[in-house]
A protein has these predicted regions:
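Cytoplasmic-side transmembrane-helix entry/capping segments in multi-pass membrane proteins
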Residues: 52-66, 176-183, 303-310
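Acidic (Asp/Glu-rich) catalytic motifs at the cytosolic membrane interface
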Residues: 95-137, 218-229, 293-295
Length: 358
């Protein structure tokens, strides 16, 4: 299939460019194979039950994610033509976006078909890390992210390397407590990178947004490292209560206050310069609907996604304005954490937690 895509690429690029694409994509697909093959014995729910008969549709979708990431990664071999051959960027963005969608549904399909497995869980984590290694580098070449976002690309590998070093030095490695937030933050990184690869979104906005997506994930890795190294014990009653209090304060105080602040910021921005001067009517309606959704807590995450799309597509507020920063980073916080208490309808929160929490 990669060879077929290479031939397809020759319709838009010279053959001497499609050949390097094929080489890098093939090497990445080989890596996908090498990551998968030694883990086939994990194609079961746990060690006490027999292996499943075949991979199943969910694992096939996960492997397809690896293939799509490889196809996207091939563009790293042809950076010189990315600005001139826009169709190549569109294809790469589409490939990674489909991979991100598969990441959202493969676990759901595994549960619906009764084929959840250790193999699927491991490959899911490995391909998340691979995708967040490949796609951000491509986004950096396109000028869509700041170089510091590459810390997200290496964070997982540094974390795993740190654990192996502790094990090699006979130091204890403590277990992590289950966390829905950990998986949610990682999943939204894929979504962020998938969006910024698309050409229409403004680089000035996507670079800033990267800070809002990056810092919570890196903070999570730091906390997790403190846990596995024994500096924090989330199972100890006092420290467990501290984490619960932080979560409670976030849900009951911080996020509701953020929604009020966002609504006020949009109202102030509107009074200073009505959005109709810079946006067409459908875009203005999207802004108003998205802000109302977040203010009322009605599918607030979906509202945050809508507002972020508008800000990145054609922002009605100058990027240099403090109000823009408020709108951008509060929307990202709501997308990652939800609207919190005093929300009218939080089905999107339940969907995110159900999908990411398994």
């Amino acid at each position: 299939m990669l060879f077929g895509m290479s031939l397809f690429a020759t319709l838009f690029t010279p053959f001497n460019h499609s050949l390097p694409w094929l080489l890098i994509s093939s090497l990445l697909w080989l890596l996908v194979y090498l990551l998968t093959r030694p883990r086939l014995h994990l194609n079961r729910i746990d060690a006490s039950v027999p292996l499943f008969d075949g991979l199943g549709w969910a694992n096939r979708m996960t492997l397809a994610r690896g293939w799509l990431i490889a196809a996207c990664g091939g563009c790293l071999a042809i950076p010189a033509i990315l600005e001139d051959a826009a169709v190549v960027v569109w294809i790469a963005a589409a490939a990674y976006s489909i991979a991100a969608i598969f990441d959202r549904v493969d676990g759901f399909i595994a549960r619906k078909t009764g084929r959840t497995s250790q193999l699927g869980a491991e490959l899911d984590t490995l391909f998340d890390a691979l995708g967040l290694m490949v796609a951000p580098v491509l986004a950096l070449l396109l000028g869509k992210i700041h170089w510091s976002y590459l810390l997200v690309s290496v964070a997982y590998y540094l974390f795993v390397a740190g654990i192996k070093i502790r094990q090699r030095n006979k130091l204890p490695v403590y277990p992590l407590a289950p966390s829905q937030l950990r998986r949610t933050l990682a999943g939204f990184q894929m979504g962020y990178v998938a969006v910024v690869l698309w050409p229409p979104f403004d680089a000035g906005v996507t670079v800033l947004a990267g800070v809002g997506f990056m810092l919570p994930l890196l903070s999570g890795f730091l906390v997790d490292w403190c846990v596995v190294s024994g500096r924090i014990n989330p199972f100890e009653p006092t420290q467990k209560a501290l984490f619960e209090n932080i979560k409670r304060a976030t849900d009951t105080v911080a996020m509701p206050a953020a929604r009020v602040l966002l609504t006020a910021a949009v109202c102030v921005a509107w009074s200073a310069d009505p959005f109709t001067r810079t946006l067409d009517i459908p875009a203005v309606l999207l802004v108003l609907v998205s802000v109302l959704m977040m203010a009322a807590g009605v599918a607030g995450r979906a509202g945050a996604m809508l507002l972020l799309m508008v800000l990145a597509w054609n922002t009605p507020i100058a990027v240099t304005e403090p109000l823009f920063y408020l709108c951008l980073f509060i929307s990202i916080a709501i997308l990652l954490l939800g609207c919190g208490r005093y929300s009218l309808w939080q089905h999107d929160d339940h969907w995110v937690n159900r999908q990411d929490g398994a």
